A protein has these predicted regions:
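Serine-esterase "nucleophile elbow" of acetyl-processing enzymes
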Residues: 2-54, 60, 65, 78-82, ...
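Short secondary-structure capping/turn micro-motifs that flank functional sites
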Residues: 56-58, 188-189
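Alpha-helical cap/lid subdomain in secreted, periplasmic
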Residues: 4-6, 45, 69-207
Length: 208
């Protein structure tokens, strides 16, 4: 790929599902298996795909148990300024909001996604650039797992996570964003109940 020939720039803003956390082995998926990388391969020089995934990132909530800033709204302006100009921002967040000490409710994630859209649309971009188009993506629902640590963190939020797709779809209609349900093509691995194996990670791009 020749960078000078890219036509569009796409920001993929997310958590460990975008970073590429591999539930099998608790390591990181190979570059070519992460869904932003698969998207890049499919688009070729038509677009530059920027993967901004951080393990544990929430929509708008603080996680004081984390070693880095997981609040997606607080860090977003810096990321927008770093990568401007942007043509499309793809936001897939909400899974970590389901932790009981974070929010634990799908409606909270809706408010969080609304705030992220407001940040993107209201940001003071350099060189008078226009805000990018926005695609809201609902992450695959959480599922049951025998892993005791992940079950304690995410088990209470399974039912709420199943509501994210319909809630995000309604929000996208209300505020004029695109919408995609990643759960329509990918399922969380029962190994930890949250993350995606390589095949399901790649499937997000194909569905999108």
């Amino acid at each position: 790929l020749r960078l000078e020939r890219f036509v569009k720039t796409i920001l993929c803003y997310g958590d460990s599902l975008t970073w590429g956390y591999n539930p099998v082995g608790a390591d990181r998926h190979a570059y070519e298996d992460r869904w932003p990388s698969v998207l890049q391969a499919g688009l070729g020089n038509a677009a530059l795909v920027i993967a901004e995934g951080l393990n544990g990132r929430t929509t708008i909530f603080n996680d004081h148990a984390a070693g880095a800033d997981r609040n997606g709204a607080r860090i977003l302006p810096t990321i927008l300024m770093t990568h401007a100009p942007l043509d499309l921002a793809v936001i897939m967040l909400g899974s970590n909001d389901m932790k009981p000490w974070i929010a634990g409710h799908a409606q909270a994630s809706k408010q969080g996604m609304q705030r992220l859209v407001d940040v993107i649309r209201g940001h003071d971009y350099p060189l008078d650039d226009e805000p990018p188009d926005i695609l809201l993506v609902a992450p695959p629902a959480l599922c049951e797992t025998a892993d005791p640590d992940f079950a304690a963190m995410f088990g209470p939020g399974i039912a709420q996570s199943r509501m994210l797709a319909s809630i995000y779809a309604d929000l996208a209609d209300e505020i004029g964003c695109g919408f995609f349900d990643a759960g329509s093509v990918a399922k969380a691995s029962p190994v930890d109940g949250v993350h995606l194996d390589a095949a399901n990670t790649r499937a997000i791009r194909r569905g999108m």
